[in-house]
């Protein structure tokens, strides 16, 4: 079930494949902020940047 999956991708081709399959995608690439990745669930330039975001404490619920 695509709604229960997450792809972490480092190429535009892989990003397109995941998007075509209806799978949420996080992009890790130097050009991740490029407009072609705007539909990504997350965009990071490096793996450490993603790992830092994942380890951050979530904001308190209001």
Task: Annotate each predicted stretch with a short phrase.
Residues 1-62:
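Asp-based, Mg2+/Mn2+-dependent phosphohydrolase catalytic module
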């Amino acid at each position: 079930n695509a709604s229960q999956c997450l792809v972490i991708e480092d190429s535009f081709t892989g990003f397109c494949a995941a998007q075509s399959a209806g799978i949420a995608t996080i992009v890790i690439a130097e050009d991740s902020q490029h407009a072609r990745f705007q539909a990504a669930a997350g965009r990071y330039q490096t793996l450490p940047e993603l790992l830092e975001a994942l380890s951050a404490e979530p904001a308190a619920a209001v």
